[in-house]
Amino acid sequence: MALSMLSSIPNLITHTRLPIIIKSSSCKASPRGIKVKIGNSNCEEIIVRRTANYHPTIWDYDYVQSLRSDYVGETYTRRLDKLKRDVKPMLGKVKKPLDQLELIDVLQRLGIYYHFKDEIKRILNGIYNQYNRHEEWQKDDLYATALEFRLLRQHGYDVPQDVFSRFKDDTGSFKACLCEDMKGMLCLYEASYLCVQGESTMEQARDFAHRHLGKGLEQNIDQNLAIEVKHALELPLHWRMPRLEARWFIDVYEKRQDMNPILLEFAKLDFNMVQATHQEDLRHMSSWWSSTRLGEKLNFARDRLMENFLWTVGVIFEPQYGYCRRMSTKVNTLITIIDDVYDVYGTMDELELFTDVVDRWDINAMDPLPEYMKLCFLALYNSTNEMAYDALKEHGLHIVSYLRKAWSDLCKSYLLEAKWYYSRYTPSLQEYISNSWISISGPVILVHAYFLVANPITKEALQSLERYHNIIRWSSMILRLSDDLGTSLDELKRGDVPKSIQCYMYETGASEEDARKHTSYLIGETWKKLNEDGAVESPFPETFIGIAMNLARMAQCMYQHGDGHGIEYGETEDRVLSLLVEPIPSLSSE
């Protein structure tokens, strides 16, 4: 089938100019080419390369190095500790289960839950142990039932969908009277995104809540509730980047009638102090990036240090994980450069050489590489070995084999896509996906992340890591499909392989609109798998599972309004400013 498809290609990509190699007997230089001397002959080979015309970074070195926060020092540390001591007793004083759940929900959405993980776990354990008693506090209360369901599932407790059966009528449909409870409907909608495969009740709940929440917005409902409903319908809470959600929710919470001023002050101060930590990480990485000179030497590629750092903040923002953010930023930045080598600049012969060198992981094998690839490989080799050296010091483990395998697999997947491009081959959707969940770089990111946060490192986890456990696969799949929704048209214009949308159109004859709907459907189905594998007993620590989930969330954040990684303006610029540059205005009581 693959061979038969080589002869045909959709009109969508036939206009793309292919990179070509011209052997010039007259030895004239092409203004679009690079002249390379061929042996001792008088002729030169002119390699005409593609260009993606990426815009230079808007975040220059001097600007990044100038970022400073006022929220550092002993005064703020003492104030934060005092607020933390004030908040902790709240978790012990609330006794009613619904009050406990509401407090936990607020702490999570404000982004300060990580200070109280043990207390939250103790409360949820108590609630779960009483779960099957069907106490009066939740009976016939859609809001309470949905909130309990969402929080327990989010924290890995096995809660059945049947808990919502009592809200159905004799026909099996959700009761019409529920539509009057907009707060409960919103909570039901958010809870439905914690579903796993085969849960028809949760699918039914999502459709029911979505439909009636949309109608509710047309009515005169509470303004603050309407803001939360619009926000949820745009993207559900379970799919949102936690740090960005915290920044949004702090503003929303400040306007609520039930706002607790101690919680609000704590959330604002913690956000600003953590932002100061992120700025320190960012300045450190800016110095590293400048020292590599890759942005200068490989000017065909995207210079996206800030965006790559933003990814790491989205994946793991807590202040104690600075080393993870810094090393992950190196990984992300190298991925971006190498991706552009394969997608934009390299010839087929060069790409095959580079893939072989990465697979062999031998600096003595890189002599045949062109100079730009030597720089690229050495940066990759040195950064990876630096991380492996740190792991050897800290854990006594030799992890190079795991890291190099991940990079080798990535480059091989890039090479396959390059072969598809040069042969003008459009794969089936399944064939595309079976390769592209690796080429999106999720496995590389997550394999490195495991070694950056896991302690201890277990044999079972290493085995699961090597064969790419499902939690890695599903997270990477969501990353791939979200990327395709946001970038496919731009990438086709600059001469990339067809993405999932075009593969589905070519295979089925569907319209672009229908293909996009199908891709969105696949994202939803993959989230169900990720929910399931994130909740079952796992060889991985909770922190790593959170990273895998957050990588999927970050993908939907970055590609929600287009190519948020490659295009720096608009939403991405606003997010960088709100998360990494601008502190939240202080309360007058600070």
Curated annotation (Swiss-Prot):
Belongs to the terpene synthase family. Mg(2+) 1 binds at D339, D343. Mediates the conversion of geranyl diphosphate into alpha-terpineol, a monoterpenol. Monoterpenols contribute to the final grape and wine aroma and flavor. Also forms some 1,8-cineole and traces of other monoterpenoids. Mg(2+) 2 binds at D339, D343. The Asp-Asp-Xaa-Xaa-Asp/Glu (DDXXD/E) motif is important for the catalytic activity, presumably through binding to Mg(2+). Keywords: Lyase, Magnesium, Metal-binding. It catalyses: (2E)-geranyl diphosphate + H2O = (S)-alpha-terpineol + diphosphate. SUPFAM superfamilies: Terpenoid cyclases/Protein prenyltransferases, Terpenoid synthases. A motif (DDXXD motif) lies at residues 339-343. The keyword Lyase applies. This is (-)-alpha-terpineol synthase. One of its GO terms (molecular function) is terpene synthase activity. It comes from the Eukaryota. Gene3D superfamilies: Farnesyl Diphosphate Synthase, Terpene synthase, N-terminal domain. GO terms for biological process: diterpenoid biosynthetic process. Its EC number is 4.2.3.111. Binds 3 Mg(2+) ions per subunit.
